[in-house]
Amino acid sequence: MGNSINLSILIPLIPMGMALFILILLVSFNRTINRLTKPVSFLLVFSLLVSALISSYLYLKKIEGELFLSNYVKVFESKNLALHINSLNEKIIICFTLIISIGIGVLFFKLPRQKGYVTLLIVISLISSSIIFALMFLDFSVLI
């Protein structure tokens, strides 16, 4: 169980990492990346769905607990920041990532894919990963 709970750190980091990777590519190859809207959309949706898959794995295996960030990042050694992993958090994260993935799919089909489209997707992915981090910092089990 200890190793499985360590997977939970990847839930917000996968979409954030993919968005930052595409942002670096956008800055480096601006014209080319703006033309590649289909692969960018696919990669961002795929990263969100992988996060939902990890969340559903943790939910189905009934893995709960806290993951202290001081174990991973030395900056947080003096702080007691912890990611809370419980069934309610996992349900919320699964629903949220699926809704954002569907939203990106709707944007793909409805919006004209012009110059700011890739930037919009990067911003949506960064905001969604920040919200996932915030959801994991909150302990919803005390509300029940």
Name each model-derived stretch.
Residues 20-24, 56, 105, 129-136:
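Alpha-helical transmembrane segments of multipass membrane proteins
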